[in-house]
Each structure stands twice: as C-alpha cells, then as structure tokens.
Amino acid sequence: MTSPATLVLIPARMAATRLPGKPLLDIAGLPMVVQVLRRAQAAEIGRVAVATDAPEIAAAVTAHGGEVVMTRADHPSGSDRIFEALQTLDPDRKIETVINLQGDFPTIRPEQIGAVLGPLADPAVDIATLAAEIHTEEEATNPNVVKVIGSPLAADRLRALYFTRATAPWGDGPRYHHIGLYGYRRAALERFVALPPSPLELREKLEQLRALEAGMRIDVGIVDTVPRGVDTPADLETARRVLGG
C-alpha cells in the first residue's frame, strides 16, 4: 500500500565510463532509468521520483510520465544527491522514510523494493538494506561482489556488522551478497550525509561503512536473488534478454 510518508528516489547521472549514457540505453523499448521507475511504481510503497543533474535524463523520464527533481552536478555520492532531492520535494518534512534505488537495476522485482521497508519496522534500526545468499565460490571470491557480515536476527534478517569486498566470514555457513538498495529514516539520512568519509569507507570504497563506523544500526533483509545491475555491455545484453528486448 502506497504511503505518503515514503519516498522512493532513483539517482541517475550520465557519467558512466564503461557504458556512456547508461540511464538512457534502451531495454525492451524503454530507457533503463524508466524501467527502474516502472518497477518502483509497481512496488506501490510511496511517491517515486528520479533525481538527476542531466537534462536528457529529466526529459526521458517526464516523457514517460515520471517525476523528476533536478540536482547539482557535484555530488560525491548517490546519497548526497537523494538528500538534496528530498529537501526540494519535501520542504514541509512530511516524508519519514527515503528509499535509495539505484538507476541501473532494471530487472529488480517490485517486491524486492518493498522488502527494504521490513527492517525499519524496528524503531531501533536507522538504515535498512538487502542481501541474498552466495551459492558459488566465484561469487564469494569476486571483489566486485560486496559481502555483508551480520549477526542473524531471524531466518530472513541480519544486523550488519561489516561490509567488505573480501571473502568473509571465514568458516562454514552462509555468506551474503549485498544488494545496493537502501531504506533510510529521514533523520538517519540527514545524519549520514553530514558525516565525513570514514577510514574504512575510504579503504573498502563502500560508503555504508561510514554509517557503521558512526554507530548507526543497519539491518539487512534476506531475499532469494540478487537483481542484476548493468555496468558492462554484457550486463546490458543480459537485461535485454530478461526483459524481452
């Protein structure tokens, strides 16, 4: 059910080096960013908007009936971009929960977007995110696959203790592939973007470590599959096959 207190923001920019113009690449007859927008709308959890500094992206989204907010071009991260967008879209501070959905997840399922709200039912949780169990050694050892190490709270829930590109944790038992979808309480997002980059964040190149180093609580919902991000031409062709393009 759509909540007026929830805002889904999709940060999108044209600066990808491996896939120039990535948000506007065609997948099954729609620009990639519009495919993501459609999935966020289908999740029916709140208002949905694209946050961008690119007029081309804004034009494509509005041409397909989506909402856009223009942001500055100099943001160091998607979190900073969505915070500016939140301030623009909600000056009266009625929004309580902000979802940060990457614009290169065209195959994400609407129910996975909604799943990120689950951990926020606990008022002690500042930030929610998702992960799926790793089933292959190739995935476990790939430094481009971010692993979340967490303390189990339930069969489908972890409390995050660390995120790493290394193969971890050691020993027998499941390992989890982190999915870059976040749900923030508004106050948590405000606090997060005000913090300077942290030592472990800079070392691992993972901005969520900034929150953990500051003592913020991140809980993780476990889902069955990892949505395929689009970072390479091969990823793009896979997404086109999945979506019938």
Curated annotation (Swiss-Prot):
CDD domains: CMP-KDO-Synthetase. One of its GO terms (biological process) is lipopolysaccharide biosynthetic process. SUPFAM superfamilies: Nucleotide-diphospho-sugar transferases. Keywords: Cytoplasm, Lipopolysaccharide biosynthesis, Nucleotidyltransferase, Transferase. It comes from the Bacteria. The keyword Nucleotidyltransferase applies. It is found in: Cytoplasm. GO terms for cellular component: cytosol. Its EC number is 2.7.7.38. It is an enzyme of class 2 (transferase). Transmembrane segments: none annotated. It catalyses: 3-deoxy-alpha-D-manno-oct-2-ulosonate + CTP = CMP-3-deoxy-beta-D-manno-octulosonate + diphosphate. It holds the Pfam family CTP_transf_3. Pathway: Nucleotide-sugar biosynthesis; CMP-3-deoxy-D-manno-octulosonate biosynthesis; CMP-3-deoxy-D-manno-octulosonate from 3-deoxy-D-manno-octulosonate and CTP: step 1/1; Bacterial outer membrane biogenesis; lipopolysaccharide biosynthesis. GO terms for molecular function: 3-deoxy-manno-octulosonate cytidylyltransferase activity. InterPro entries: Cytidylyl_trans, KdsB, Nucleotide-diphossugar_trans. Activates KDO (a required 8-carbon sugar) for incorporation into bacterial lipopolysaccharide in Gram-negative bacteria. Belongs to the KdsB family. PANTHER family: 3-DEOXY-MANNO-OCTULOSONATE CYTIDYLYLTRANSFERASE, 3-DEOXY-MANNO-OCTULOSONATE CYTIDYLYLTRANSFERASE, MITOCHONDRIAL. This is 3-deoxy-manno-octulosonate cytidylyltransferase. The lineage of its organism: Bacteria, Pseudomonadati, Pseudomonadota, Alphaproteobacteria, Hyphomicrobiales.
